[in-house]
Structure formats: C-alpha cells, structure tokens
Amino acid sequence: YDKVSGVLKYSEKTSSGSYGGCVGLKDGRILVNTGQSSGRSYGTHIFFPEGNSWSKSTNEQNYAPNDQPNGSQIAIGADGKAYILCLNLGARISTNETKALVYCYDTKKTTKGQVSTPEWYTAVKGENKQTGYGLGGDGNGGVYVATDKYITAISSTGSVLWATEVAGTAYGVPAIDNEGYIYYNDAEKGSLVKLEPATGKAIASLQLGTELKSSPTISADGTIYVTGMLEGKPTLFAVEGAATGYAANAWSQMGGNPSKSGYMY
C-alpha cells in the first residue's frame, strides 16, 4: 500500500499462504515466509522490485525452500545477512537429529532468477513450533534464537556458542539491550528472563503474570515492555532495568527495533 494515500500498489499470492516473518530491505526487496501444504514447504520468498511492482522468486529459488519457517520471525544483519529459523523437515539434516534449523543467507549475493546457496545452516535444540519464534542479532554477526525449550547463541560463522534450557516454555523473539544482555519471555512461568551474553547463564528472572505469549520490546530509553495475562486480564508490563537502550546497529528484537518496522538495512 502507498503509505500516504493508502492505495493498493501490489499484491501477489504466496505459496501455501504466508504467516510469520516479513522484512523489507532498503534496496526494495522483500523477504516473505511461506506456509506449508500436504507436508510440503516452500521456505522464504524473495520479492524483487521492478519499477512500481515486484516479481517473486520461484519455490526452488526461495531461501530454505524445503524446510518450514513455521510462522517464525526473520532477522537481518547490517551486513545484509538474513537469518531464518525453520522447522526441520529433513532436507539437509535428519529429523532424528534435530527439529529446528537456522539458515543464514547473504542477501547481497542473491540475484533474480538464481538459486541461492546458504552461507551456513545450523541445528539448534528445541522445536520451532507455530508460536512466532525467531531471532535477534547483536550487530557483530551473532544471533540469538528462541525455540520452545532453548535460547541458543550462534556465531557469525554458524557455530553454536551456547544453548540455555529454559525453565518452562520460551515464547516469541529474544531482545538484546545496549549492554548485550538477552531477554526472553517464559510463557509457562510468566517470567521475563535475562541472560548473560558470554555464557547464556540466567542472571535475573522477574515474575510478571501468566501466559507471556509475546516478544519483549526494549525501548529507546531501555524500558522493557511485555504483554501477558494478569488476574485473567490482558496486561502490558513495563520493566525498568539496568539498560539504557536497545542494542545499536543490531536487529535487537522482533521486527528489528521498538517500532517493529521490519525494515532497517
């Protein structure tokens, strides 16, 4: 849609629908996760700008074309790398070994009409269920991944640095503050949890309510916002911590920033 007039500019059917992550790049390309049909998945479409319209990659040219994003949230690094969390369907690693994979693609190497090769793909613990899991980036090429039972740190080269098992069930996308600490929601325990970046050790946990089925948001002044349930009512929680802002030059949270614009680089 045109942001001034609201007039529809373009529409296109995606393979098996679309839900979860959608991000825009400053060169006009758009990354859109697809759905799944009859056990078949199509990964992440790349839309290429063509004048006042776009053309999309074929299913075979998509990122992670044979694994399933499953409603996850995409992250983009300042270097143009795209990170996608998938439910493992066995295209590259046996489903007996892992239920979740993280793919890294270099958008700068992606060209229209060509099949893109991932920079790397890495197995992570836990499962990427249909609950909006995803990734945050620290600005140095490292990413933090949420699955149902683990928060995992991955290096810029795809190596797992640490994997922290959550006490209950994680939910949403981790957020990173300007001191590098990582936050996630434990939906089952109703807690906001803070992790130390070097080791993944939990150094703080704040009981807020119940059913924290959301992703934490860190504002420009460092306030952490979380939505959940309290005494049976939908509630917005505001938490003041030690941080004074969100991670600079980083995909610091769901949507990349407090505005959730999905558009930074």
Model-derived features with residue positions:
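Extracytoplasmic/lumenal domain signature
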Residues: 1-265
